[in-house]
Amino acid sequence: MAALEEKASQVAEWLKKIFGDHPIPQYEMNARTTEILYHLSERNRVRDRDVNLVIEDLRQKASEYESEAKRLEDFLMESVNFSPANLSNTGSRFLNALVDSAIALEIKDTSLASFIPAVNDLTSDLFRTKSKSEEIKLELGKLEKNLTATLVLEKCLREDLKKADVHLSAERAKAEGRLQNMDFLKAKAAEFRFGIRAAEEQLSSRGMDASLSHRSLVALSDKLSELKQQTIPLKKKLESYLDLMPNPSLAQVKIEEAKRELDAIEAELTKKVDMMEL
């Protein structure tokens, strides 16, 4: 976090230096944009440093050329009694242009052998500079595209985050409602259990048969279902007796016994059911 704040501070100083008195364009401050602008400021700082070094070198060479020009001028004056002041305006312009060209090309003299290699080197430097400039433009274009894509992605993520917060709030409200309902149901269940226990105690104090309690009735209901299931094979067995032909009187006796047994079971079940309904 400290490193990011330091980079943001350097970026702010660099932008203030670049725009001067003009207002700095608004941009969204985040880690991604800060990192991109920081790298641009570093490259700009390195470029400014290199330019300053070149300027200092050119100043030094200009001073050397001026000294050399003064020496040559003195030499000409001593050798052939020649002075630049004796030249015509055109000659003076040519001479100044020749000197300026020699200074610009950083050559030791104004001979053709010095001028041609210097011009070739300057042409090569020009092509290299143009190529480097194109590379920088392409890189800046990529950075701009990446920055735009990053900003769009960040916007989408912020919108998704807002939607997630809204959904989470709704789910939290639902969960709280369910918890409240659960607490209410628990309280009601406890209230019902207490009421049942109190009613059972009251009925017990009045001499009620324990077999008629809610728990016993539930058990009897289960037993009733079980007995009903048990009557199914008895009914099937009874139907098989109806098909017996060898001894009709004996079969009739068996049938009557089965009917009585079945009627007794159904009567018992009916009695239990009636007691449960009461």
Swiss-Prot record:
Residues 128-150, 248-278 form a coiled coil. Contributes to mitotic spindle assembly, maintenance of centrosome integrity and completion of cytokinesis as part of the HAUS augmin-like complex. The lineage of its organism: Eukaryota, Metazoa, Chordata, Craniata, Vertebrata. Component of the HAUS augmin-like complex. The complex interacts with the gamma-tubulin ring complex and this interaction is required for spindle assembly. Associates with microtubules. The interaction with microtubules is strong during mitosis, while it is weak or absent during interphase. It is unclear whether this interaction is direct or indirect. Interacts with EML3 (phosphorylated form). Belongs to the HAUS1 family. Keywords: Cell cycle, Cell division, Coiled coil, Cytoplasm, Cytoskeleton, Microtubule, Mitosis. GO terms for cellular component: centrosome; cytosol; HAUS complex; mitotic spindle microtubule; spindle pole. One of its GO terms (biological process) is centrosome cycle. This is HAUS augmin-like complex subunit 1. It is found in: Cytoplasm; Cytoplasm, Cytoskeleton, Microtubule organizing center, Centrosome; Cytoplasm, Cytoskeleton, Spindle; Cytoplasm, Cytoskeleton, Spindle pole. It comes from the Eukaryota. Transmembrane segments: none annotated.
